[in-house]
């Protein structure tokens, strides 16, 4: 930008001069504008000068990222090659994607380009289901991650999927090429296509009004269920719902193309192996810390979330470690570890932010059994990844199993299953199929005429975890994908687990879609992990969701 003065009217006049002197050559101006892309100050300055209304400003910025390129990946069919790694195709050939941390920025050639670029904004969904931008990060001083719903905006994905005996090829682009279709989240109810789609940046906590909110620095609301979410999210407005299949599919496409593997945990594992309980070794009073052995403390991560308390029930003869037990949270409920320091040669002090409320780390009794004060790991607060240096990555380690991650700006895998709001799994005559509703105002606690059944059967895993080797695909409902074959392992195929009832022995019924895994899923977890054996009203401490802006869509574009 050494050739442009980007200050106020000077920058404005220079670009206007170019525009008026040669109005017929848009390609020239696009080339100039694209040089702004790597200069955030200039980019935001240009947006505010050339577009007044916020949605137009957002479109202006996103359109500068438009390349028209086709980014692809090919994966062999499992019986051709069980390898999880794919082969980059078309314009993705030669590109590199590496996740970052808070201290190391990985190389990511996709970052900031085309459909992979995310614009961070505050906004809301209007009554018609359209996303309205309120404030844009970098332009508006009013922008806030903590006080207003925060979203990532992306250019609409145009998708081409080819599946044959050799495998599956996925191609995404920011332009409509022959044979491509728009992603589900972008299709309006009138079948026109939105220029961009919005993804909630954070799992949904509660805002100051007590309603679902996509904000940083809070506990995501837990104990969610398919049925419970209908009520919870509609309290914000009938145009809202929890995470949709379209939301999930959007992010899955970005991951699969950018990182060219189906084994998502090999790149970023998320908080999927951080299920710990440690006992106090020294009793203290009037403190906001707990003393535990050094070896135990070495397993904990500063910045992560824990609870401190005494179990009020036993599991066999021992105190329960089920996080659903209220006693485990009675002294410090889902609080952040602020520091860990040596206490003596054998023990460490783990400090937490309990808002100034002090507690004792003494024992209690359950019957005749002594129950020591314990510290248990819990899902992270939202905003845990706010300091990651790139658009993808984890705070400390991408593959330890202890950290959540962001994927092109969207934070996920805090330690919760993510409940999908607009899909119901139906068991009929011992066969499970997925049914999707494209209008969140019509979400129901049963499969009604507003739901569309997908055209494939889901693999019966016989009440055991099995690893997905092939996902079903219905071109009429392309956002909904579940395992139809489960012959893989933790390091082959999709490398993610799927769980169903014994369908051959199960009566007709309905199940919710729990996606991704939780604190204790370990190698079963990942982008395609699915627990499909819980009823629609079943909730648990490890179930959460995010706001969706794609609740009101059509099945297909005109």
Which stretches of residues belong to each language-model region?
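A short, polar/charged loop-to-alpha-helix boundary motif
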Residues: 427-439
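C-terminal, surface-exposed recognition/capping segments
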Residues: 61-63, 69-71, 75-80, 337, ...
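Extracellular "spike/adhesin" assembly and maturation modules
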Residues: 1-49
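Carbohydrate-recognition beta-sandwich/jelly-roll modules
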Residues: 101, 143, 149-191, 196, ...
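Acidic glycine-/aspartate-rich tracts in secreted/extracellular proteins
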Residues: 42, 157-159, 203-204, 247, ...
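GGW-centered surface loops in extracellular recognition modules
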Residues: 54-153, 161, 300, 350, ...
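Short aromatic-cysteine micro-motif
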Residues: 141, 145-147, 179-311, 323-413
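Hydrophobic beta-strand signal
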Residues: 16, 307, 418-419
């Amino acid at each position: 930008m050494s050739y442009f003065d980007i200050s106020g009217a000077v920058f404005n006049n220079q670009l206007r001069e170019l525009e008026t002197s040669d109005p017929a050559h848009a390609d020239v101006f696009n080339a100039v504008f694209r040089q702004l892309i790597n200069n955030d100050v200039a980019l935001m300055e240009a947006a505010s000068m050339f577009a007044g209304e916020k949605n137009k400003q957002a479109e202006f910025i996103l359109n500068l990222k438009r390349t028209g390129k086709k980014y692809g990946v090919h994966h062999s069919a499992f019986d051709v090659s069980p390898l999880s790694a794919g082969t980059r195709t078309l314009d993705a050939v030669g590109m590199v994607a590496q996740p970052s941390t808070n201290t190391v920025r990985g190389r990511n050639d996709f970052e900031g380009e085309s459909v992979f670029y995310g614009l961070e904004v505050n906004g809301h969904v209007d009554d018609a289901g359209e996303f309205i931008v309120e404030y844009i990060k970098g332009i508006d001083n009013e922008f806030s991650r903590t006080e207003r719903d925060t979203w990532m905006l992306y250019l609409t994905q145009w998708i081409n999927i080819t599946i044959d005996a050799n495998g599956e090829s996925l191609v995404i682009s920011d332009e409509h090429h022959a044979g491509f279709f728009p992603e589900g989240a972008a299709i309006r109810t009138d079948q026109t296509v939105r220029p961009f789609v919005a993804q909630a940046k954070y799992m949904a906590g509660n805002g100051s009004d007590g309603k679902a909110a996509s904000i940083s620095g809070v506990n995501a609301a837990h104990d969610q269920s398919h049925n419970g979410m209908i009520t919870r999210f509609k309290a914000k407005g009938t145009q809202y719902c929890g995470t949709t299949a379209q939301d999930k599919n959007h992010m899955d496409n970005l991951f699969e193309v950018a990182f060219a593997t189906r084994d998502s945990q090999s790149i970023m594992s998320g908080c999927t192996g951080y299920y710990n309980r440690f006992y106090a070794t020294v009793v203290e009073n009037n403190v906001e810390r707990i003393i535990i052995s050094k070896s135990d403390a070495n397993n904990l991560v500063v910045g992560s979330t824990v609870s401190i308390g005494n179990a009020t029930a036993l599991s066999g003869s021992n105190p329960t470690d089920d996080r659903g037990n209220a006693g485990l949270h009675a002294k410090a409920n889902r609080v952040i570890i602020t520091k860990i320091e040596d206490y003596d040669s054998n023990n460490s002090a783990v400090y937490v932010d309990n808002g100034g409320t002090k507690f004792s780390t003494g024992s209690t009794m359950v019957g005749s059994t002594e129950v020591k004060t314990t510290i248990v790991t819990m899902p992270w607060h939202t905003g845990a990844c706010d300091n990651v240096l790139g658009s993808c990555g984890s705070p400390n380690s991408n593959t330890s199993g202890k950290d959540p991650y962001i994927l092109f700006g969207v934070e996920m895998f805090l330690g919760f299953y993510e409940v999908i709001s607009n899909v119901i799994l139906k068991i009929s005559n011992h066969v499970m199929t997925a049914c999707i509703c494209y209008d969140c105002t019509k979400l129901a606690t049963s499969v009604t005429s507003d739901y569309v059944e997908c055209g494939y059967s889901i693999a019966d895993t016989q009440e055991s975890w099995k690893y997905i080797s092939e996902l079903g695909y219905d071109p009429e409902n392309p956002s909904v994908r579940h395992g139809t074959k489960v012959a893989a392992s933790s390091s082959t195929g999709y490398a993610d687990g799927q769980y169903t009832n014994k369908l051959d022995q199960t009566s007709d019924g309905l199940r919710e879609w729990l996606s991704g895994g939780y604190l204790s899923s370990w190698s079963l977890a990942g982008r395609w992990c699915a627990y499909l054996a819980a009823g629609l009203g079943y909730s648990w401490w490890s179930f959460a969701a995010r706001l969706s802006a794609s609740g009101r869509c059509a099945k297909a574009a005109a």
